[in-house]
Amino acid sequence: MSTIPLRHSRRQWLPLFLLYLVSTLIILPAATLAADAGVKVSRFAHLPSKVSYFDDSSVVLYHDATAGVVYRSEDEGKTWSPVSGSSSGKAAMLVPHPYDKKQAFILSRELTHWRSTDRGKTWQEFLTPEPPATRAGPPMEFHADEKHWDWIIFTGKKCSMWTPWGGRICHDEAYYTTNAFATNPPRLLEFVMHCNWAKATPEMQTSTDALERIFCIAWEDAQEQRRSMVAGGTGGSTRLFQSDDFFKSRKMVELDMGRNARQFAGLGPSKRFLVTALRDSQGSSSKAGTEMALFVTKDGVKWEKAKFPHGSELRENAYTVVDSTSHSIMIDVVDSVYDNTGVLFTSDSTGTQFVESLRGTRRTPQGLVDFEHLVKIDGVGIANVQSEAEGGVRSMITFDDGSSWHTLKPPAEDDKGKRIDCDPSDAENCALHLWSVSGKTNVGKLFSSVAPGFVMGVGTIGKGLKNYDECDTFLSIDAGRTWKMVSRDAHKYEFGDQGSVLVMVDDEDVTDHVSYSTNFGKTWNKLSLGVTMRAKVLTTIPDSTSLKFLLVGSQTRKQAGGKDRNVVIFLDFAEMKKSKCRESDMEKWYVQAAAEGSCLMGHKQWYKRRKPDADCFIQDKFHDPEDKEDPCPCTDADYECDFGFVRDKQGECVATGNEHIPEGACAKPSDTYLGSSGYRKVPGNTCDAGKGIRKDEKTQKSCSGKNMPQKGSVLHKSFTFPSLVVDKMYFPESSSVLVQLADGTVFQSLNDGYSWKQLNGDGAPSSAEDRFLTMALHAYDPKRGYLITAGQRVYYTTNQGASWSWFSVPLPANGLGINILDFHPDRSDWLIWTGSRDCTFSTAKQCHAEAWYSVSNGAKWEKIDSYVRTCSWARDKKLKMDARAIFCESYQDKKGNQREFTAANRLELIRGDEFYRKRTRVFDAVVGFAVFEQYLVVAEYVTTSSAPGLQLHVSLNGRDFAPIHFPPGMQLGTRAYTVLDSVTDAIFLHFTTHSEAGSEWGTLLKSNSNGTFYTQSLDFVNRNDKGFVDFEKMMGLDGVAIVNVVSNPDDASVSRQKDLVTRITHNDGGRWKSLVPPSRDVYGQPYECNKVGCDLHLHGFTERDDPRDTYSSPSAVGLMMGVGNVGRKLAPYRDSDTFLTRDGGFSWEEVHKDAHKWEFGDQGSIIVLVNDEQATDSVLYSLNEGVTWESYTFGERMRISQIVTVPEDTHRRFILVGTPSGSATKSVAIYLDFSALESRKCVLNVAKPEADDFELWSPSEERAEQCLFGRQTYYYRRKRRADCYVGEKIVQPHSVSRNCSCTEADFECEFNHYRDAKGTCVLYPGVSPLSTDAASQCWAADSDGYWYERTNVRKIPYSWCTQGSRPDRGTRHVCSNNLRAHGFLWWFFVIGCAFGLAGLVGYWWAKKQSSRPGYGSSGRIRLPDASNRLYGRDSELVQNLASVPRFVLGAASAGFARFREIASDRIPFVRNRLDRSRGAYGGYRHLSTDEDAAMLPDFEEEEFER
């Protein structure tokens, strides 16, 4: 019975139990699904300067550089504690070992530092002889070989304290350790710039013999460097040294330049390569010595020079080694400094042959380039280019390592599924553009991570990139092929668990949550943080395999509520308790190129990746995803153009110049050689050529028809043009030449004239508007040229004619005699176009000129002004005006036919600032203006009571103008004038004094240094009826000029028959003298005229067919040639002979009878002559500067009009242009190649000059010492009988030995003075000398503390002479600013008062601070070493000083600079003191490189925004 109630009880509870069980089963999964990520907040006093994870571990370090403390977490940032040891308050730098996963270093600013070998758990103290140096790179360089990870190079900063006044000078010293600082490191090398191990990266295939090798950039002579640093200079040239025994012995790395391998600027690794940069003293361009050369090594033994396409200039601080691959180097070279754009080049697998990949890349002034490779994805990279679209920046993506580029395909819908109003097929107006490296707001890689295929970015859809706060956030899960918008507004983002978790946080405003997605961005959830903050950094472990993240942010005081304002939030998505993915949750994901399913870099790369909808986590922590590859057959897409080839319009790779023929090949035309096919496989491409096409295989080519002469012989080839040649244009430093024909066609040769092809726009000319009117070479950019048509289309090249494009202009070119194109000196894309409107018919009533400008190389135009005569950029190479200013000659009355305008319609000179938007009338009426070097000269039309006339003005800044003063009796009036030259800090001007037709001449005037006061240099200087003057400066030697003078002015004014004589100056017009004639002619016979007055006379500038022909050469220093005669006057041209000088015109010799045209080649080692009196079928050439001549016959007789070669005269190939006998309607070009006459390259050995092929030569005036312009300057020139060719451009001058003592040759007549018959400078009758300007002398940079009364002479502006005779100085007076002008008591009183006042102010400040509440409390900002110095760097006094407006400090700096100039010459100790207190590293330079490139990275610790 008792059991019945029990049974009944069970029956009652059973339903309840079942209900509970079912409820539990239902509730538990729901609870599991609802589980969210964990959030843990930690607070810190300051933001970190670095957050560093130990690879493949959960340990992370947080470096607070402000407090000098390093914190450590063992659980990926959940909990934190300061590291052990005594580094607290002293940690200035945290340096993880890049290869050893357990080592890290804490560096202080002093000598004591700390090392950990157990991921920061314990720290051991170690000492270094000097504190760390970060001037030229990181202070520690690590050996990359696993057996040598404890081998470290440490660079320290050594400073010397001296004098009671403080101050110091510093230099870098290198030390090394082979046991990770277990013992004190010994010194490696003193006075270094930077050192690297030969095994600098794990990828480098360093030879076994070079594993212990160290490379250092250092000064060859440490003592010389020490002396130069004390003197305030940069010292001797840096060189690259190597050592295999820690510099117990060392060897200079000569590369292939011998002892010219100097002035190294950088050294650093890039994946498989070690790269060094130095100044290229043996380049083939005219900029040799100013450009940089790159050398590359893969094994630490053999260095090879990197070769770039023609016209690519590597200037110091103007290139960046960017995020390269393991199989090639990518370098971005500055293309436009002011527009911050570059050209991206990619190398072959050797790292030496570079081809252009992308033009117009966006870069910052600091050298950061908007380019990044996607992590773990072969061949895919994203770059930004500058454009004229809205926003100005467009994003491009490559899927073949830069061989081709495409725009990013935008999504069709926004994050809410709403259709975006944009047509993706219109890539020009509808593309995705992303913020890149230059706008980086997070740490680590910008776009991608190890998570395969995942790419995120912040950007906009449209024509171009918008401001960051106008952007949205986008995601791609297929390596950039397609994109989707995942959120409005800009966000920071991070990837976790190989892409299973995506996290992003608002990057525009404060936020209290993050968003995350576990299904590849399909849906997003919010995770509350529990605090409101401004996100600074979002990061996770480097391999993105963890489910834990760190979010660093900062709060306002109100948000923090009195707590520390910087928060580190630990986000733990492992707490979501998702299951571990199984094999069925994974899929094979292929990296696809732009075309669906296609191969990428010659293979199909794939990863195992979680399926997008799989509800699991991979949870394979610390294990990077491994890629697999399926090989593909080679296709056209797997090849790119080889070095020296570019793609034409049909997409084929064609040679850009002379094709390289192997040395020794082509001994005769019937031979063959193996040459490039024009293609090479894209570096890193692994396609199977056996199963596809092979385009990179060397091909057998015939020597027949190749421009390769047989050894010891000359090669020629003729080409007949269909019309007469009327103009030519040779691109500097190239083999590209253009000729324009009379029929309006243009022909081009890319191989110095060996072969020619006609240039057409889009096929054959179809109308008269397609005729070419003229050619224009960019005045400042040697790579650019323009072909102007009769219509509104202009063809242009940016690569010296290798390829051509076109742009449209708003109006046809003007036919009003006005310059059509004007070029900006600094910004190659900035153009001014002057066209004509309504000028089609001669009877047009409103015909006028209009000027337009473009800042996009013709892509877009803006109107400047109408009815103008000239518009040009105000800025010039030496006239440093605002870059956007424009000068225009603009007519006052803007109506009517401009062709019929008279002086009644005034021509105003307008300066338009901000691209002519703000206009200022500079002069009411002008005749014209022109810029000459640093001088802007304006001819103003003035009307006086007597008669109208001209007044010249000059300006050095384009704003302030001063009238030009001529000698007495020389009033310009309406006389003609010609501004001739201004390269030697003075203007030469020809003032016409006799303008009768047939007997024109004038006076040659020369200005002072600011162009205002002119003195007579030479009278009766010849000119012609067009205003051209027989005046020519010698190229390569400053101050040497040749003129022709009318010797019979009285007779010539009546007979109009001028007798000309030649004069030369070697001191810039200070004195003129006759040309010393040779004693005998070319046959050794004496001249008929051999008495006093029998001089050498040469035909000058006014008689030349082509004004571009010159006496001298820019590269053959000291050489000049001319046609003339020995006698009492210049004989007719056909009665003249040919003469040569080797020493700048001091002595001459006759080299051939009869008049000849001439041209220099190979920097003067070859001279070519052709008869200029009659038709000829041969040329003469000399390989020994005219000692002997050889004749070469080229075939049919022709009347030669021109000898053409590259403008620098550095080639051994020439073009003869002429007309055949009996034909006056067609021109013929004869190609001549002399390169096989000499096979040995001249040797320049600085160490053993007696054993090389060059001699040092110094031009000399008529004085006891060898000086020119008061300076002894040495030039290299090939020995006259050396059997070799020069080759690369020699940097001239070689050296400046010293400044010479002043002599009479360094002075010229002062204003209002002239030279009388005795050569003495005398005052013009009835005038007064200029008054003395004492102030300008006393405040001049070279003032000696005195001012001097004027005399009858002045020092030639360009003379460098010092001391010696100074006839320009009269009575001496002490300057008022001279310290010697005051006595000892005066200076004692002034200095004492200053120190007393400073002491009172300091005492008052200290008392005030000590009485302030809270002074010295914990809230005060302290120095990193926690000191409490009142006048420390971060003291409140300094902070207040920092708030003073900059112009006040600028004024103080200017005053101090002025004081230094005075005091350094007055007080003995002040000179050295002021020179030495120039900061710790005055005189050193930084090499601008990419942050992500290993080559000299900026090793500042400011990785995070503060």
Swiss-Prot record:
Which residues bear sugar attachments?
N1010, N1299
Swiss-Prot/TrEMBL BNR repeat ranges: 71-82, 114-124, 396-406, 474-484, 516-525, 795-805, 1181-1190
Its subcellular locations are: Golgi apparatus, trans-Golgi network membrane; Prevacuolar compartment membrane
Looking at the Swiss-Prot or TrEMBL record, what is one Pfam family this protein matches? Sortilin_C
- GO annotation terms (biological process): Golgi to endosome transport; Golgi to vacuole transport; protein targeting to vacuole
Topology term for the membrane = Single-pass type I membrane protein
- The residues on the Cytoplasmic side of the membrane are 1405-1506
Q: Which UniProt keywords apply?
A: Glycoprotein, Golgi apparatus, Membrane, Protein transport, Receptor, Repeat, Signal, Transmembrane, Transmembrane helix, Transport
Membrane side Lumenal: which residues? Answer: 35-1383
List, alphabetically, the InterPro entries matched. Answer: Sortilin_C, Sortilin_N, VPS10, VPS10-sortilin, WD40/YVTN_repeat-like_dom_sf
TM segment ranges: 1384-1404
Signal sequence coordinates? 1-34
List the GO cellular component terms: cytosol; Golgi apparatus; membrane
Biological role stated in the UniProt entry = Functions as a sorting receptor in the Golgi compartment required for the intracellular sorting and delivery of soluble vacuolar proteins, like carboxypeptidase Y (CPY) and proteinase A. Executes multiple rounds of sorting by cycling between the late Golgi and a prevacuolar endosome-like compartment.
Family listed: Belongs to the VPS10-related sortilin family.
Q: What is this protein called?
A: Vacuolar protein sorting/targeting protein 10
Which organism does this record belong to? Mycosarcoma maydis (Corn smut fungus)
